[in-house]
Amino acid sequence: MAMAEGERTECAEPPRDEPPAEGTLKRAEELKTQANDYFKAKDYENAIKFYSQAIELNPSNAIYYGNRSLAYLRTECYGYALGDATRAIELDKKYIKGYYRRAASNMALGKFRAALRDYETVVKVKPNDKDAKMKYQECSKIVKQKAFERAIAGDEHRRSVVDSLDIESMTIEDEYSGPKLEDGKVTITFMKDLMQWYKDQKKLHRKCAYQILVQVKEVLCKLSTLVETTLKETEKITVCGDTHGQFYDLLNIFELNGLPSETNPYIFNGDFVDRGSFSVEVILTLFGFKLLYPDHFHLLRGNHETDNMNQIYGFEGEVKAKYTAQMYELFSEVFEWLPLAQCINGKVLIMHGGLFSEDGVTLDDIRKIERNRQPPDSGPMCDLLWSDPQPQNGRSVSKRGVSCQFGPDVTKAFLEENQLDYIIRSHEVKAEGYEVAHGGRCVTVFSAPNYCDQMGNKASYIHLQGSDLRPQFHQFTAVPHPNVKPMAYANTLLQLGMM
């Protein structure tokens, strides 16, 4: 999710030789006050706009950068947030909020050691601040955990959780009245019962969950990194974007558009989990349908099907709360086998993030990506999961701090080289649930309405018909869900108001 295109101004303007006049300073303060009001109203795009105007008038005020950094954090523009926080500290090394903001930005980017250094600075300056101490201690735990994971990775990196499971010996207790696989297989009856069971806020038995995970891993590992699908003229397929643990909105998609079947195929374009607090329900439902219709129900990996994101934004915590740490490890293994892209009739390419940091990438290059891993910090795999379009030509540094932003000329050149018509991607919330950019060559679809219970956005899904492949957009709005807030299982730092 991110702010609208074209709103960004540079983070670090060069200081002026002469200080601004008193009237200019007064106007800058008025703009900051307006920005603060927009921020309180959760209108972060306008908050950023007015903070930026204040900075233009007075580029030496650390508070303006600190405030805009927080607004960027709320819109998931972590790269911009990091730049603003760093600039605030450069302007005023005693501005403690600058260190808080920079730590939050680095946490969001998975740069835990860098975050720890800033939390340490805050604790030294404010040794009696309980909030600062708690954040420092929590971040320190993560750094130590990561160090431990690296230490044991050499011995166990390729050892599968599956090897240590004995599913057959797991007993389903007599008092459990929920859905069970029939002879170890997913059926349509099981799936209907499962969705109702989840709708009633009940938990699937761990044996059934493990059965689904082990079986879906077997299915996914046989797929190509680039899935290629042919639609006949009379056939259609539905493409959905981010669902982010919003299970009741997922049910609404199936209510509006029909359950998956061999005649009603789906593609879900990544970011199934995190943020929403029903991520386990979402992902096991999607995996169940993948087992039921392996050739007609498609799942692509998003940037949130990764360990770093799951550790921060809730999925790891949710699986541990509802099941066990071992089950989360198996989820992580399964996520590594999710394909990265899908091509329809050789003309429409679908991926979660977008296009590439370098020219000349071909479909064959995508096919050759070894996806069974955590994504690197750069390169084609990273770009497919993380990049975003921009309105201006060329490429620029990513607002997220990962991968890049690519312009209409980049999209046009990629499509021409690969004989494609357009791309479909997700990865960003859009007010109307979708966006058509780059002269119709870059389509964004987002399927989590009222994202995180606060954005107020519509959501959408796309129909593609084999006869012409023109995208047909279908919008929908959020439905009620049980009183469990988003991020309920997120990292403690997030719950403490890190962002």
From Swiss-Prot:
The modification N-acetylalanine is found at residue 2. TPR repeats lie at residues 28-61, 62-95, 96-129. InterPro entries: Calcineurin-like_PHP_ApaH, Metallo-depent_PP-like, PP5_C, PPP_dom, PPP_phosphatase, Ser/Thr-sp_prot-phosphatase, TPR-like_helical_dom_sf, TPR_rpt. Autoinhibited. In the autoinhibited state, the TPR domain interacts with the catalytic region and prevents substrate access to the catalytic pocket. Allosterically activated by various polyunsaturated fatty acids, free long-chain fatty-acids and long-chain fatty acyl-CoA esters, arachidonic acid being the most effective activator. HSP90A and probably RAC1, GNA12 and GNA13 can also release the autoinhibition by the TPR repeat. Activation by RAC1, GNA12 and GNA13 is synergistic with the one produced by fatty acids binding. Inhibited by okadaic acid. Substrate binds at residues 244, 275, 303-304, 400, 427. Changing residue 29 to A: No effect on phosphatase activity. Residues 200-499 are annotated as: Catalytic. Changing residue 40 to A: Slightly reduces activation by arachidonic acid. Changing residue 97 to A: No effect on phosphatase activity. One of its GO terms (biological process) is negative regulation of apoptotic process. Its main location: nucleus. Changing residue 101 to A: No effect on phosphatase activity. PANTHER family: SERINE/THREONINE-PROTEIN PHOSPHATASE 5-RELATED, SERINE_THREONINE-PROTEIN PHOSPHATASE 5. Probably forms a complex composed of chaperones HSP90 and HSP70, co-chaperones STIP1/HOP, CDC37, PPP5C, PTGES3/p23, TSC1 and client protein TSC2. Probably forms a complex composed of chaperones HSP90 and HSP70, co-chaperones CDC37, PPP5C, TSC1 and client protein TSC2, CDK4, AKT, RAF1 and NR3C1; this complex does not contain co-chaperones STIP1/HOP and PTGES3/p23. Part of a complex with HSP90/HSP90AA1 and steroid receptors. Interacts (via TPR repeats) with HSP90AA1 (via TPR repeat-binding motif) or HSPA1A/HSPA1B; the interaction is direct and activates the phosphatase activity. This is Serine/threonine-protein phosphatase 5. The lineage of its organism: Eukaryota, Metazoa, Chordata, Craniata, Vertebrata.
